[in-house]
Amino acid sequence: MKTVVFAYHDMGCLGIEALLAAGYEISAIFTHTDNPGEKAFYGSVARLAAERGIPVYAPDNVNHPLWVERIAQLSPEVIFSFYYRHLICDEILQLAPRGAFNLHGSLLPKYRGRAPLNWVLVNGETETGVTLHRMVKRADAGAIVAQLRVAIAPDDIAITLHHKLCHAARQLLEQTLPAIKHGNILEIAQRENEATCFGRRTPDDSFLEWHKSASVLHNMVRAVADPWPGAFSYVGNQKFTVWSSRVHPHASKAQPGSVISVAPLLIACGDGALEIVTGQAGDGITMQGSQLAQTLGLVQGSRLNSQPACAARRRTRVLILGVNGFIGNHLTERLLREDHYEVYGLDIGSDAISRFMNHPHFHFVEGDISIHSEWIEYHVKKCDVVLPLVAIATPIEYTRNPLRVFELDFEENLRIIRYCVKYRKRIIFPSTSEVYGMCSDKYFDEDHSNLIVGPVNKPRWIYSVSKQLLDRVIWAYGEKEGLQFTLFRPFNWMGPRLDNLNAARIGSSRAITQLILNLVEGSPIKLIDGGKQKRCFTDIRDGIEALYRIIENAGNRCDGEIINIGNPENEASIEELGEMLLASFEKHPLRHYFPPFAGFRVVESSSYYGKGYQDVEHRKPSIRNARRCLDWEPKIDMQETIDETLDFFLRTVDLTDKPS
């Protein structure tokens, strides 16, 4: 049976050997070039392929149409993937009439995603395994063909567990590959409600946070022990690595991170104490804990920290343009909740951020981005992270003031992007779910969905294409000039301080604010073209948590990424949104202050938005990038968001002249 194989690492080598032993004909192997910054302790797929006389390739992007065509010419009957590090596009998967199969290092549906070997140890699991599953468009989500369980011993570290998994994988493939060859397999669908997903790990993720329990820190040490980069901490600015450890149930009142003793080297944790058995100072040699203490100059009572002392003193400076807006003010609140951010903001108003004005780490200037260009350039140069959140983002303005939308949303933001390029500053840019336009995909995917808009004589698309072109400009600056960037695409975020009722009175607001105004004034709720259009509504708290994690950028996982931030489970039509809002309104304790409900009224979009409007029937995000890069899932139910948003707006209404 002819096959094409995608493989890397030890699992890739043993997978290839198993295929050959089972009588498969391998037409080509696709692998990766080794990363010079990665310790190569594993077998070389490229070398094995060369020794076996099999053509081998390592393209940067195997999903490029040219490679898809070359693979199609090989006419594979079946495709296998063994620890290949990139997602394989659906066009390639569909080339094999007998299907495509992937070997994954966990007991799916648990631990989908990257580095399951390390994550199970980090999380203190006692069992894992290997799974052979059918490949589908969504990573690690296809039906299970075979699994083998592997026990995790208390003394297992990453390398010993790796060897166990390799042994299990050989057994599993020996048993299963002949059955696949003869079409004699039983597939079991994964239980989505049991699925968990984890993102890529980098060396920077393995710092020891001493406020955590000793058992948690010991698991971190096990998960990244040699030949992985190791768990680490600091004494002042001196970095050291912990290669092995033991948990002590030591009852101590010492502050977490304090040295309890140096022989053995015992460190106080949030719960218990951790003995550092072996470690390494800087780029030195491995030594026992007591010698490490001497090398680092530690004595009883010394304090360790999770980051260099100089870094701990320096707050990250974040520039938010449009800080008084819906996202800006909520993000400011989230950043100031931590003690390592300095927020600089500019906006034309300050009502939503008045609660921060006396905060020592919040600095605000009232101004217009089209006028205060010198102030903006200076602060781009001064700050570490830039978020240009200023935009006209209400649909009625797209047809009413298309040129103003272009001037502000495109031209002014392009200038800020160029400042970031000039001063080599990280930019986190708010793209929009609008860029997907009339895409027909069930889930809008950042990396694969087409961006489809209407004709030029429909000015409603000027916002979408302005944002899309900026996305492409930023991407090009990243590719050609090294701009550090992340694009995020919000999907219908809702919550307190979204617009205001005065904006709704002139039609320049989002949908829920307009509906609340109708209820407050006793006017009919207008359902544009029947209100059947579906959206996925996302609580502002979920959205801001994801955005905060983008700013944190653990392990630089967000660099160069486009990330949808939305809740695909909170899908509802505008009509359903209105009905849910009405039910919440009728139960509200302030309900008696407002007029009777005036009913729903269906209106044509042209009469509401004006000439040149087109609507989108559905807009549902894929959030695989958010899961992978941020370890993020939305949690808040739509009804809770509606209740809190309604309550906020009703309490802003002056009730002094309302009948009680």
From Swiss-Prot:
CDD domains documented for this protein: Arna_FMT_C, Arna_like_SDR_e, FMT_core_ArnA_N
Entry keyword Transferase: yes
EC number(s) stated in the UniProt entry for this protein: 2.1.2.13, 1.1.1.305
Residues involved in UDP-alpha-D-glucuronate binding: 393, 398, 432-433, 460, 492, 526-535, 613
GO MF annotation list: carboxy-lyase activity; UDP-4-amino-4-deoxy-L-arabinose formyltransferase activity; UDP-glucuronate dehydrogenase activity
Binding site for (6R)-10-formyltetrahydrofolate: 86-88, 114, 136-140
Pfam families: Epimerase, Formyl_trans_C, Formyl_trans_N
Biological pathway: Nucleotide-sugar biosynthesis; UDP-4-deoxy-4-formamido-beta-L-arabinose biosynthesis; UDP-4-deoxy-4-formamido-beta-L-arabinose from UDP-alpha-D-glucuronate: step 1/3; Nucleotide-sugar biosynthesis; UDP-4-deoxy-4-formamido-beta-L-arabinose biosynthesis; UDP-4-deoxy-4-formamido-beta-L-arabinose from UDP-alpha-D-glucuronate: step 3/3; Bacterial outer membrane biogenesis; lipopolysaccharide biosynthesis
Recorded family membership: In the N-terminal section; belongs to the Fmt family. UDP-L-Ara4N formyltransferase subfamily. In the C-terminal section; belongs to the NAD(P)-dependent epimerase/dehydratase family. UDP-glucuronic acid decarboxylase subfamily.
Entry function: Bifunctional enzyme that catalyzes the oxidative decarboxylation of UDP-glucuronic acid (UDP-GlcUA) to UDP-4-keto-arabinose (UDP-Ara4O) and the addition of a formyl group to UDP-4-amino-4-deoxy-L-arabinose (UDP-L-Ara4N) to form UDP-L-4-formamido-arabinose (UDP-L-Ara4FN). The modified arabinose is attached to lipid A and is required for resistance to polymyxin and cationic antimicrobial peptides.
Record's protein name: Bifunctional polymyxin resistance protein ArnA
Organism: Escherichia coli O6:H1 (strain CFT073 / ATCC 700928 / UPEC)
